[in-house]
Amino acid sequence: MRLVVCLVFLASFALVCQGQVYKGGYTRPIPRPPPFVRPLPGGPIGPYNGCPISCRGISFSQARSYCSRLGRCCHVGKGYSG
């Protein structure tokens, strides 16, 4: 019996770690933050806004700042949108 309880616990823990479990009994998945990528150092600068055109080389907080202040958000493999 203890073995079954232990295996069930480990399986549920693995699902939580993989983000495949639903929280609170709802049928929606646990939200994950959007993936931000880093711009290349010394990369091109967008006109009139000071934002790098590439999304590589910037920190997560810089990417969030660009998104909130300037309406330009980094997306993996797509550069900025907005």
Swiss-Prot record:
List the signal peptide residues. 1-19
List the disulfide bonds in this chain: 55-73, 67-74
Question: What InterPro entries does the record point to?
Answer: Penaeidin (IPR009226)
Localization recorded for this chain is: Cytoplasmic granule
**According to its UniProt record, what is one Pfam family this protein matches?**
Penaeidin
Specify the superkingdom. Answer: Eukaryota
- Chief subcellular site? cytoplasm
Residue positions where Serine amide is found in the record: 81
Q: A Gene Ontology molecular-function term?
A: chitin binding
GO CC terms of this entry:
cytoplasm
Any Gene Ontology biological process? killing of cells of another organism
Q: Which UniProt keywords apply?
A: Amidation, Antibiotic, Antimicrobial, Chitin-binding, Disulfide bond, Fungicide, Pyrrolidone carboxylic acid, Signal
Pyrrolidone carboxylic acid: residues bearing it: 20
Function (record text): Antibacterial and antifungal activity. Presents chitin-binding activity.
Protein family membership = Belongs to the penaeidin family.
**What name goes with this protein?**
Penaeidin-3h
Give the source species: Penaeus vannamei
